[in-house]
């Protein structure tokens, strides 16, 4: 007798997953999606299989706002092994060069200085960036090297934690688009000994609280023991993905007009500079507005289900 098919459902919010080592971000995202029986899911910036830590999973309407988390700052704890370079710049690759390590802590501290602030970084070949529609890692696996342009990134903090030769542990607070593997590889070259990542843990995305993270095995246990309503309580509200944007609350008349897809007048346009989070008179999150020649939400949530609204 066959098992009854799961009923997929509309469920909205952000789940803070503590990603385990050894799984791809997409595979673990699909598992979370199945456990919540969600119609839609998306992650907010891939972590390498080697890496662990915070991976926000957007469900339902929250997927419309995942780009804001992709663009958010990140924090990492990383351990590098000095003296060895690998083809992937991490422990999953093949060692391609071995050099002697004879460093004092002060030499490392001095080398770190040049990696702080606004810098340029050439992405690793083992990345998901695309060239002619194909991910770079596919070229790399075929032994093909593609020329990549250096990209601007910002290292807000690069803190020395521990050096127990040949292992060096650092804490990194960085902008979007930063490859920690490349950062470690570049540091190894500056130090003259080479280096690769042996441990990588993402400790923060935007302002999400670390205490809210949950491992997949705990989520699995809850899913097996409790109804879906209990799992839903683990979800953070959709608007947390855009919590850094200023909020604009509509009055009852404006909310009513929005519901009918009508134009809405604002008494104070200064409230609408840049992007804002839009809330109804009942404090329901409606979406994000961008300032152009007129106002229209770039995305809006399930409450209204309108893709574009004109504003005056």
Swiss-Prot record:
Catalytic activity: uridine(55) in tRNA = pseudouridine(55) in tRNA
Record's keyword terms, sorted: Isomerase, tRNA processing
InterPro entries: PsdUridine_synth_cat_dom_sf, PsdUridine_synth_N, PUA_sf, tRNA_psdUridine_synth_TruB, tRNA_sdUridine_synth_fam1_C, TruB_C
Name this protein carries in UniProt: tRNA pseudouridine synthase B
GO BP field: mRNA pseudouridine synthesis; tRNA modification; tRNA pseudouridine synthesis
Enzyme active site: 48 (nucleophile)
Gene for this chain: truB
Pfam assignment, any one: TruB-C_2
UniProt-listed SUPFAM superfamilies: Pseudouridine synthase
GO molecular function: pseudouridine synthase activity; RNA binding; tRNA pseudouridine(55) synthase activity
Family according to the record: Belongs to the pseudouridine synthase TruB family. Type 1 subfamily.
Biological role stated in the UniProt entry: Responsible for synthesis of pseudouridine from uracil-55 in the psi GC loop of transfer RNAs.
């Amino acid at each position: 007798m066959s098992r009854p098919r799961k009923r997929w459902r509309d469920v909205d919010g952000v789940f803070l997953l503590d990603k385990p080592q050894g799984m791809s971000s997409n595979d673990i995202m699909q598992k979370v999606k199945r456990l919540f029986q969600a119609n839609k899911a998306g992650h907010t910036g891939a972590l390498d299989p080697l890496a662990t830590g915070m991976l926000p999973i957007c469900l339902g309407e929250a997927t419309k706002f995942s780009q804001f988390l992709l663009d958010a700052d990140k924090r990492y704890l990383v351990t590098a092994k000095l003296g060895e370079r690998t083809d992937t710049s991490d422990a999953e690759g093949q060692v391609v060069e071995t050099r002697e390590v004879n460093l004092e802590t002060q030499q490392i501290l001095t080398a770190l200085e040049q990696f702080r602030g606004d810098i340029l970084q050439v992405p690793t070949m083992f990345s998901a960036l695309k060239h002619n529609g194909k991910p770079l890692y596919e070229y790399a696996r075929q032994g093909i090297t593609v020329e990549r342009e250096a990209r601007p990134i910002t290292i807000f903090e690069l803190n020395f934690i521990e050096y127990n030769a040949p292992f060096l542990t650092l804490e990194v607070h960085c902008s979007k688009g930063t490859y920690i593997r490349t950062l470690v590889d570049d540091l190894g070259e500056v130090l003259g000994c080479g280096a690769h990542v042996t441990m990588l843990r993402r400790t923060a995305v935007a302002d999400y609280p670390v205490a809210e993270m949950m491992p997949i095995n705990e989520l699995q246990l809850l899913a097996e023991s409790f109804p879906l309503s209990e799992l839903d309580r683990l979800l953070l509200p959709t608007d947390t993905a855009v919590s850094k944007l200023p909020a604009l609350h509509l009055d009852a008349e404006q909310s009513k007009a929005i519901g009918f897809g009508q134009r809405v007048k604002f008494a104070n346009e200064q409230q609408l500079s840049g992007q804002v989070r839009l809330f109804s008179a009942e404090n329901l999150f409606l979406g994000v507005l961008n300032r152009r020649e007129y106002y229209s939400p770039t995305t809006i949530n399930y409450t209204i289900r309108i893709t574009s609204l004109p504003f005056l």
